[in-house]
């Protein structure tokens, strides 16, 4: 199974050509990422950060820009988790427009850290592994 959500592309997200300005793809990805925690673990991302005291800094990101997304389009994001390591999680993103055209893909690796010691890795908790299994892919 995957996490799937949609969002309209608003004017502040586009450049003068009226297409999504490239840094906004990562902004959109992060917004969908935060939303995915409600689907997988039943909690808002701020609960993970401030109550569970767990952070996930991004340590690697690769993306392919395949087709422009324009002002007013609806982007559908699909997120899967291809790998959960001891201390890291790999996230795969696919953005499609309202016509189903694949526009952007990305693979991102985040590292699990303690919010009190963000520079120190920690093991991905078992409860989190169980939650993320909902969107784990092979």
List where the protein language model places each region:
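Generic hydrophobic/packing signal
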Residues: 14, 22-23, 30-35, 69, ...
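Hot-dog-fold acyl-thioester-processing enzymes
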Residues: 1-59, 113-138
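Preference for bulky hydrophobic residues occupying beta-strand positions
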Residues: 7-9, 63, 79, 93, ...
């Amino acid at each position: 199974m995957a996490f799937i959500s949609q969002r309209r592309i608003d004017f502040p997200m586009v450049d003068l050509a009226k297409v999504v300005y490239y840094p906004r793809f990562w902004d959109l990805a992060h917004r969908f990422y935060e939303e995915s925690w409600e689907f997988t673990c039943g909690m808002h991302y701020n609960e993970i950060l401030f109550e569970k005291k767990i952070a996930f800094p991004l340590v690697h990101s690769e993306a392919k820009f395949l087709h422009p997304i324009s002002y007013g389009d609806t982007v559908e994001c699909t997120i899967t988790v291809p790998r959960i390591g001891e201390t890291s999680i790999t996230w795969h993103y696919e953005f499609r427009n309202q016509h189903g055209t694949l526009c952007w893909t990305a693979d991102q690796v985040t590292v699990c850290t303690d919010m009190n010691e963000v520079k120190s890795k920690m093991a991905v908790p078992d409860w989190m592994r169980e939650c993320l299994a909902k969107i784990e892919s092979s």
